[in-house]
């Protein structure tokens, strides 16, 4: 009972309250940002259907992560208001089992969907000549595989979970005695996978950006490569953010975990809650996507404005320029035709001249060879 009361005191610690409020705020802010993205940009981005399927997985992941984070924080403060004693504030793990599994599944789905986007863009780069005419089978298969891999990984991770273990919130992972170490392993595997994906993304981005600077390929290939560049440019910051946040979290919390037994009661949980960056990642992901889309729109408007400014010529001048161009092209074409016809005309003229001279010579010889008539 004494240990229960000691753990229940976490609910009243200012540093722990700050961590929960911060997490809940991030969760709630995810939804208006997603609404802005879907309203302003979702129907103005014309990507291949395969890519759209995989990017929608990221949207679903952000919705799940943001929603569960907001729910966990709300449930925390509701319990704080209605539960009378510290022991009543604690939750049994079986109450949160599905919520924890869904949160970890959504977080793992972020990485597997990024891997799917990498494979899809790699195939789009390889078959750039005919990828636009290919169907939606690749995107559907990659999306199913991404969901299946994430679900299988979380199912294996939660197998040793103790349903009777007492926890403060449903998103308490690192302090869990039954699955805490396994969650760290999953985060570390995600960190390695995201690092590999980031490197390959960078290679694909530079290849697609530099392969056709002179526009020597077909218009369809140029469009597909441009789509590759835009997509990889948008996804790469998300991968970098994921690598940095997970890496920093694993490193710092692992160090504190070594000295867990030497810290005052509840202080490891307080430190872990304030450093637990995963509940903030949907807010950071959506914010990065919104900023990238806004910068892309601003860049596109500037390019369009510069193009219009370079063509800002009065109407009469445009007419004269067009007429001059027509005259120039007509004269050059006429001269080319004349040069092409000059050689055959010269040959015909030479042969006809020789025939005429030959006939005249025959006539002259014939006249000279006529004998005189007798008188």
From Swiss-Prot:
Top-rank lineage group of the source organism: Eukaryota
Transmembrane segments: 17-37, 51-71, 99-119, 138-158, 183-203, 236-256, 275-295
Keywords: Membrane, Transmembrane, Transmembrane helix
Molecular function as annotated in GO: olfactory receptor activity
Cysteines engaged in disulfide bonds, as pairs: none
Single GO BP term: detection of chemical stimulus involved in sensory perception
Subcellular location(s) of the protein: Membrane
Topology in membrane: Multi-pass membrane protein
GO cellular component terms listed in the entry, alphabetical order: membrane
Similarity section: Belongs to the nematode receptor-like protein sra family.
Record protein name field: Serpentine receptor class alpha-39
Species: Caenorhabditis elegans
Taxonomic path: Eukaryota, Metazoa, Ecdysozoa, Nematoda, Chromadorea
């Amino acid at each position: 009972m004494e240990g229960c009361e000691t753990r229940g005191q976490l609910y009243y610690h200012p540093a722990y309250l700050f961590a929960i409020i911060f997490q809940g705020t991030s969760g709630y802010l995810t939804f208006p940002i997603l609404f802005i993205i879907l309203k302003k940009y979702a129907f103005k981005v014309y990507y291949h259907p395969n890519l759209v399927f995989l990017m929608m997985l990221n949207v679903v992941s952000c919705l799940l992560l943001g929603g569960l984070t907001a729910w966990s924080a709300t449930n925390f403060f509701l319990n704080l208001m209605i539960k009378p004693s510290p022991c009543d504030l604690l939750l049994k793990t079986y109450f949160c089992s599905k919520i924890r599994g869904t949160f970890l599944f959504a977080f793992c789905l972020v990485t597997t969907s990024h891997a799917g986007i990498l494979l899809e863009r790699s195939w789009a780069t390889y078959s750039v000549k005919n990828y636009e005419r290919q169907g939606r089978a690749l995107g559907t298969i990659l999306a199913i595989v991404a969901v299946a891999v994430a679900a299988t990984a979380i199912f294996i991770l939660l197998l040793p979970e103790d349903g009777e273990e007492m926890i403060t919130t449903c998103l308490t992972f690192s302090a869990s005695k039954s699955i805490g170490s396994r969650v760290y392993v999953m985060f570390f595997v995600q960190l390695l996978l995201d690092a590999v994906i980031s490197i390959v993304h960078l290679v694909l981005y530079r290849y697609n950006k530099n392969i056709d600077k002179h526009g020597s390929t077909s218009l369809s290939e140029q469009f597909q490569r441009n789509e590759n560049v835009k997509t990889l440019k948008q996804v790469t910051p998300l991968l970098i953010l994921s690598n940095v946040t997970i890496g920093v979290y694993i490193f710092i919390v692992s160090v504190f975990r070594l000295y867990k037994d030497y810290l005052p009661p509840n202080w490891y949980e307080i430190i872990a809650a304030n450093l637990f960056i995963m509940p903030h990642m949907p807010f950071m992901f959506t914010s990065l996507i919104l900023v990238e889309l806004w910068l892309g729109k601003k860049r596109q408007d500037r390019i369009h404005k510069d193009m219009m400014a370079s063509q800002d010529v009065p109407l009469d001048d445009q007419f004269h320029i067009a007429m001059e161009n027509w005259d120039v092209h007509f004269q050059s074409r006429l001269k080319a035709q004349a040069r092409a016809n000059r050689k055959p005309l010269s040959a015909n003229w030479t042969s006809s001249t020789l025939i005429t001279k030959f006939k005249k010579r025959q006539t002259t010889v014939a006249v000279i060879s006529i004998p005189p008539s007798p008188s």
